């Protein structure tokens, strides 16, 4: 597929995610996909998508920048949402805080046959946890920090 076709597929996936439909996103992930060099597969991505959808039922994604070349796709994105459900992570579960988040990150995909086989993703986890009130954000006063 061409770089332009890969961009079009990705934009449709984001559009569907913003409508609350996780299925196209899961079909975009190859059954043997890796995330940050570790095996994840479609089932791992399904779990990740379901956890985020439960924790942030009003989640919205905005594409800030999208670059494609050959089989590579690089995205600078923004995610907003309100923490209304449990956020189950690998170390702990964060109960709903009712706080809004507004984070950005970058993802890079290697695409083959219309599916992401390799995903590299980064965002500022400390900023994310600070916005949830789980940790004190840089510059946040002691009085405003969680107890």
Residue spans for each PLM region:
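C-terminal and inter-domain tail/linker signature
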Residues: 1-147
